[in-house]
Design a protein with these regions (language model features):
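Transmembrane beta-strands of outer-membrane beta-barrel proteins
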Residues: 46-50, 86-88, 123, 139-143, ...
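Short glycine/proline- and aromatic-enriched beta-strand/turn motifs that initiate or cap beta-hairpins
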Residues: 25-82, 86
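Outer-membrane beta-barrel "beta-signal"
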Residues: 124, 238-239, 254-266
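Solvent-exposed loop/turn segments connecting transmembrane beta-strands
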Residues: 62-67, 94, 135, 226-228, ...
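Extracellular loop and loop/strand-boundary signature of outer-membrane beta-barrel proteins
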Residues: 58-63, 106-116, 163-170, 218-222, ...
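Outer-membrane beta-barrel transmembrane domain signature
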Residues: 78, 131, 135-137, 144-244, ...
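Residues that define the transmembrane beta-barrel architecture of outer-membrane proteins
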Residues: 44-46, 66-72, 101, 117-123, ...
């Protein structure tokens, strides 16, 4: 009896272990990955979604900086046979980088410490594949990449030994790519729970318009990238009414990213 009980609940046990491992990871990635299995109809069809994503990460060159973003996006996807899906997103995002304007030179003062810019457009492409082991348990994998269409720019003013200055910092060519795999369990009412690990790489170029003593960055492009390439994710997909689904997802690290999306299956 105990053996049958363990076998019956094996998918839930494995999923729980993955959730624990995911929480222990040290990085987050940009955007929802979504359920491992497409929500499109069995015979093939379109689904669309609108979503929001709150993202935090640590980027580094010689110094670590916390990065925060709020993303709003619209998605169109096509999937079939409950096993594959391709999708595209278009959205807008802000960008905040903490303590990037701190001066290490006592003769230089600045009017603020943090970089902030609002609402630049980005695009995302992704694909996923799913293998149903049985009606409850399945495994899947995905790849997803995001690129921003324009630069983020913020102005800064201050003084150097009492002499005023004005300059700006640009964050250019911000992009990321993610690849992951996971397990999915379907529980009563068609609710899908999923979790797994992923690898993640993100990069951007940072440049200051002019050289300012004491500021970390200078004229000329300097590359920054995410601090750690490994992460974990978990989420659930909840059927609502008349083709609508609610997707809630978190990506865990020393910082936390999370978001939600509402999709409609045609």
């Amino acid at each position: 009896m105990k053996r049958k009980l363990i076998i019956k609940n094996f998918p839930v046990i494995v999923l729980t272990v993955l959730l624990i491992l995911s929480i222990g990871q040290t990085v987050t990635a940009s955007g929802l990955f979504g359920p491992l299995q497409t929500v499109s109809k069995q015979d093939g069809g379109l689904n669309t979604a609108i979503g929001y994503w709150y993202h935090e990460d640590t980027y580094q060159n010689d110094t670590n900086h916390t990065v925060r973003q709020n993303e709003i996006y619209s998605q169109a996807a096509y999937g079939a046979k409950n096993i594959w899906e391709i999708y595209a997103r278009i959205g807008i995002s802000d960008l905040k980088i903490f303590d990037i304007f701190n001066s290490t030179d006592a003769s230089t003062t600045t009017n603020k410490n943090d970089f902030e810019e609002n609402w630049k457009f980005f695009g995302t492409l992704g694909a996923k594949a799913f293998y149903p082991i049985n009606k409850v348990f399945g495994v899947g994998a995905f790849i997803q990449g995001t690129s921003y269409f324009s630069n983020f720019t913020d102005d800064i003013v201050g003084t150097i030994s009492g002499t005023p200055f004005t300059t700006d910092l640009k964050v250019k060519n911000l992009w990321d790519v993610n690849f992951g795999a996971g397990l999915q369990v379907t529980i009563p009412h068609g609710i899908k729970l999923y979790a797994g690990p992923y690898i993640y790489y993100s990069e951007a170029e940072v440049s200051l318009a002019s050289n300012i003593p004491g500021l970390e960055y200078s004229a000329g492009d300097v590359s920054i990238k995410n601090k750690t390439m490994l992460g974990g994710f978990t989420g659930l997909d909840i059927p609502l009414i008349k083709g609508f689904h609610l997707n809630i997802e978190g990506q865990f690290s020393d910082r936390f990213s999370a978001g939600a999306a509402v999709s409609y299956t045609y």
